[in-house]
Design a protein with these regions (language model features):
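Conserved, mostly hydrophobic/aromatic
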Residues: 42, 54, 84, 111, ...
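N-terminal secretory signal peptides and thylakoid transit peptides that target proteins
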Residues: 1-19
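Structured C-terminal cap/extension of enzyme domains
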Residues: 82, 230-341
């Protein structure tokens, strides 16, 4: 889950974006009441989350963006966002000879600056991309330190792609031991799993452990190849799990002149599915405000409109679902970062 840069540069009308921002500004000034974002239950956790949540990528994971990142995070909370997602891997420097837990990621660092004073206002989620017990515990300690908190509301296995990873996680001294230990010691409240690569692998993961939540890729192109909707989403709903959608703009690749040309369609599409919330990383406050405005005004799409959006993506599935590329047998030169939401 990355930014919507292509959306803004190429497709979103300045007037529409300005109108959304102006409406939210009036609300902030107290001169006009805006509807609150709808809430949904986060599965069996008992928590209610707003239908739009803030992702910890895009600007928030980049070095040198402290002021912009803190502005986005604070504005999100001001607008009613009560779920923030991040990961130990987000914004982590790539330094040879260093272990994961020796490298502090920018996303958790920036979010932690805000959490120092606003922790009680949000449900805070992070992730471990280490598949071992000891490595994951070190990453959890790092997350708590950077996020300036004594516990996470949700700790997740990050981007499960292959059965070999599941075997390591559930094997001797695997990461699942860290998740259980952390929950027993009240360092985390709930446990989750995430992925956007191969839905069959995630289904097998759900069969091996009673996770509380799942973060999965969902957008109008999903149904065309290796669908998450009919497999992972269906199983997660059956298990009464909290479901968080990601990859809605697909790093901007879902937007094409001949296809989908704005964020409202795909965001409304995913919110019309049986999900608890969605996460999107934002480049700036204006993007955040536009997403919140769409969420506030959300009404479920009729089946015909859902089908129309799916049809628009049918000619560029390998772009709109690029994150499935290896599992789907596609390749794109230069796409070397699978460890993102």
């Amino acid at each position: 889950m990355r930014d919507q840069t292509l959306t803004r540069r190429e497709f979103v009308k300045v007037g529409a974006a300005g109108a959304a921002g102006a409406a939210l500004a009036l609300t902030a000034a107290g001169t006009e009441a805006a509807p609150a974002m709808p809430e949904r239950p986060l599965g069996r956790t008992g928590h209610k989350v707003r239908i739009f949540s803030l992702g910890g990528q895009a600007t928030i994971e980049k070095p040198g963006t402290r002021d912009e990142s803190i502005a986005i995070i604070n504005r999100a909370i001001d607008l009613g966002v009560n779920y923030i997602d991040t990961a130990a891997a987000y914004g982590r420097p790539r330094t040879e000879g260093k272990e994961r837990w020796e490298l502090d990621g920018w996303s958790q660092t920036y979010i932690g600056e805000v959490m120092a004073t606003r922790r009680k206002e949000v449900f805070l989620a992070s992730k471990t991309d280490d598949r071992t017990r000891d490595g994951s515990m070190r990453l959890l300690e790092q997350s708590l330190r950077l996020l300036k908190t004594d516990h996470l509301d949700l700790w997740q296995l990050h981007n499960i792609m292959r059965d070999e990873q599941l075997d390591q996680i559930f094997g001797k001294d695997g990461a699942i031991e860290a998740l259980q230990k952390a929950k027993d010691q009240k360092m985390v409240r709930y446990l989750g799993i995430t992925g956007h690569f191969d839905p069959a692998v995630l289904v097998r993961g759900l069969d091996r452990f009673p996770f509380d939540t799942i973060l999965m890729a969902l957008n109008p192109a999903d149904k065309h190849h290796l669908p998450f909707v009919s497999t992972v989403l269906a199983l997660a709903n059956k298990k009464n799990m909290g479901v968080i959608g990601m990859k809605i703009p697909a790093r901007g690749r879902i937007f094409k002149p001949e296809g989908i040309n704005g964020i409202k369609g795909p965001l409304s599409y995913v919110l019309s599915l049986p999900v608890s919330t969605v996460i999107i990383g934002c480049d700036n406050v204006q993007q955040l405000e536009e997403n919140v405005e769409i969420a506030r005004a959300f009404k479920p799409l009729p089946a015909a409109e859902m089908a129309r959006l799916e049809g628009l993506t049918s000619t560029y599935v390998n772009d709109a679902s690029w994150f499935k590329r290896d599992a789907a047998g596609w390749t794109r030169p230069g796409d070397d970062d699978q460890n993102t939401e």
